[in-house]
Structure formats: structure tokens, C-alpha cells
Amino acid sequence: MKPSIYSLTRDELIAWAVERGQKQFRATQIWDWLYKKRVQSFEEMTNISKDFVSILNDSFCVNPLKQRVVQESADGTVKYLFELPDGMLIETVLMRQHYGHSVCVTTQVGCNIGCTFCASGLIKKQRDLNSGEITAQIMLVQKYFDDRKQGERVSHVVVMGIGEPFDNYKNVMCFLRVINDDNGLAIGARHITVSTSGLAHKIRDFANEGVQVNLAVSLHAPNNDLRSSIMRVNRSFPLEKLFSAIEYYIEKTNRRVTFEYIMLNEVNDSIKQAQELADLTKTIRKLSYVNLIPYNPVSEHDQYSRSPKERVLAFYDVLKKNGVNCVVRQEHGTDIDAACGQLRSKTMKKDREKVTATK
């Protein structure tokens, strides 16, 4: 299976071309075709010789993804189900915001983190996506904009789809360099957010990268007992280890950390738990932010339900009274398969039923 050329950073593409007897400017031309003109085949690169186009075709594909399902919400949110070359399925979501167009990308096929409320982990991790497969998600959403011819562009990226980004660290970092490159898509680092469930050692590595990309941490509980019961990752990286790494990140980068907190009715949404959360973040209050997230119910996790609005607001009020920077997140795509991993899970179930029916 040929890798996608999207897997290469600009420097790597230059090195690859020079090794094959080409001048550096040839790689720059190819890069422009990929990320500025956004062609979908090497044959469209009209200033590249046929011989070198043949070498490109022998070495790479362009976009490795095939579109399987598209769901569009009344609010303009678009959810894509893409098929990988090996037949595996992944999800990507386009969210229209007042500040621009944000795309949520997937980094793994399945997830091993094992959060008990999440649809992503219904199917265990089967493999990591390579950086080209992650970048290809952005390119196909941008193609959707290009085809509309309204001058729209992907302006923001959130690495919050299926999988744990820091469990696929090398490929995610390569992806970030590709989409942030000023000579390509030029998506600003401060418009990119990477979310982790709390791999403390990788948070430290990320701090040392020196990038301006935003960090979000999926917290979802204010104490170890509850967090370990709903997020298995907490057994390896309890809150003490996690917050030590977060404090290191803040000290090293002087950048704010966002905490994501899904509101689960009568599980993590009490007044007492709001106070615990306020106390937990007290020492980093100036450089932290809490995002309260309405829960999208998942049929396979019917032990959980969405917190009523009055409980969310009461929780929010406690945080605000304690000086915590916080917001209740705006919902997107509530009339489609909104929960992360939900569309993929449903489609795989339908595919299995079709196979069974033909036997």
C-alpha cells in the first residue's frame, strides 16, 4: 500500500526530491500543487515532467481516503465517515463557528483509553493513522469548500476525534507541522487544539516541542475515585501525576490549558463536585479554562444521561463564584450522530448485518 504524499513535511518532501536528482524548487512546486492549488492527482501538476510524475505515482498516492457517508445538520455541522485503504472507517466533523470553520480530526482507528461514556471506545484500537491519513481529512473538507467556490477555508483544527492523539504522538506532530506550514494551508498554531485524556509523560513532551498549539485535557471528574471509575487512563496517570505534568506545561510554555468536562447526570455534576473542581484547578487558575460539555447520549452506554440544564447552570455558578474561567460549550450537530464514534459504530453494525443477511 503506497503512503500518502501528505505524510511528508515540506522539508521531508524537499529531501525526498533532491535524493532523486531534482532541484529543491521542484519539491516547492509539488507542495504548491498539493496545498495551494489542492489537486487530487499528480497528473494535474502541469509543470512537473511526465517522468517525475511517474516516479511520484510509483511512490505515493495523494488522498488515501474514500467518502462513505456524509451527514449534514440543520446548524451547518457536517459529519463525514471516511474509508481508509484497508477498509477501516474513521470520522471527521466540520463545525461552523462564528469565528471560522473548525474541523475535528480522528487520529486512530478505534480507541484503547476506555472511557465508559464514550462511543469512540466501543471498538478497540485497531491501528494508528499515519500523518497523511490525518492530513487527508483536512484536505477533503477543504475540497468541499473549494467545490462550493465561496472562498471558504478550514481556519481551525481540533484534534479531538476518535483515538488518543498522544498515543499516536509522532504522526500527530508531523500532521501539525504540515497544516501549520506558512507555505501551505497556513492554519495558525493558535487556531489548533490537541486534546488528551491525560497521558502525563506526553504532555511533558508536548511542552518541550516549543509549538504554539493549544492543549486541552479531558478531565471529566474532580477526584481520583470517580475519574478512575469512568476513565481507565486515570489508573495509570492519577490526578497528581496529571496535574504535575500540566503545571510543567504551563511553566514551560506560559500557555493556557483547557479542561473538558462532560456533564453526566448525577455522576459528576453535583455542587460538591463543582467545588472539588474549583479547588483542583486553584493553583493554575490564571492559565486554565473549564469547558462544560453537554453529553451526547450513546445507546451502548445507557447508564449515563445528560445533565439537566438547571444542574449544569448550578455547577457553572459554583465555578464562577470561585473565580474559575469557564463556559458551557455550544452544541453542534445534535440532529445527526453527534457523539464521537457514533456514526462509525452504527455504519459498522449495518455492514455486519448486510454480510450476515447474504450468508
Swiss-Prot record:
The active-site annotation reads E91 (proton acceptor), C340 (s-methylcysteine intermediate)
> What biological process terms from GO does the record include?
rRNA base methylation; tRNA methylation
Cellular localization per UniProt:
Cytoplasm
> Which Cys-Cys disulfides exist here?
C104-C340
The EC number(s) attached to this protein equal: 2.1.1.192
Cofactor annotation comment? Binds 1 [4Fe-4S] cluster. The cluster is coordinated with 3 cysteines and an exchangeable S-adenosyl-L-methionine.
Q: Which UniProt keywords apply?
A: 4Fe-4S, Cytoplasm, Disulfide bond, Iron, Iron-sulfur, Metal-binding, Methyltransferase, rRNA processing, S-adenosyl-L-methionine, Transferase, tRNA processing
UniProt GO molecular function: 4 iron, 4 sulfur cluster binding; metal ion binding; rRNA (adenine(2503)-C2-)-methyltransferase activity; rRNA binding; tRNA (adenine(37)-C2)-methyltransferase activity; tRNA binding
State the InterPro entries in the record: Aldolase_TIM (IPR013785), Methyltransferase_A (IPR040072), RlmN_N (IPR048641), RNA_MTrfase_RlmN (IPR027492), rRNA_lsu_MTrfase_RlmN/Cfr (IPR004383), rSAM (IPR007197)
Where S-adenosyl-L-methionine binds, per the record, is at G163, E164, S195, S218, L219, H220, N296
Cofactors (names):
[4Fe-4S] cluster
UniProt binding sites for [4Fe-4S] cluster: C111, C115, C118
Q: What is its main location?
A: cytoplasm
GO CC annotations? cytoplasm
- Which reaction is this enzyme known to catalyze? adenosine(2503) in 23S rRNA + 2 reduced [2Fe-2S]-[ferredoxin] + 2 S-adenosyl-L-methionine = 2-methyladenosine(2503) in 23S rRNA + 5'-deoxyadenosine + L-methionine + 2 oxidized [2Fe-2S]-[ferredoxin] + S-adenosyl-L-homocysteine; adenosine(37) in tRNA + 2 reduced [2Fe-2S]-[ferredoxin] + 2 S-adenosyl-L-methionine = 2-methyladenosine(37) in tRNA + 5'-deoxyadenosine + L-methionine + 2 oxidized [2Fe-2S]-[ferredoxin] + S-adenosyl-L-homocysteine
Which segments constitute the Radical SAM core domain?
97-329
Miscellaneous comment: Reaction proceeds by a ping-pong mechanism involving intermediate methylation of a conserved cysteine residue.
Please give the function described in this protein's UniProt entry.
Specifically methylates position 2 of adenine 2503 in 23S rRNA and position 2 of adenine 37 in tRNAs.
* Family membership: Belongs to the radical SAM superfamily. RlmN family.
The name on file for this protein is Probable dual-specificity RNA methyltransferase RlmN
Q: Which organism is it from?
A: Streptococcus pyogenes serotype M1
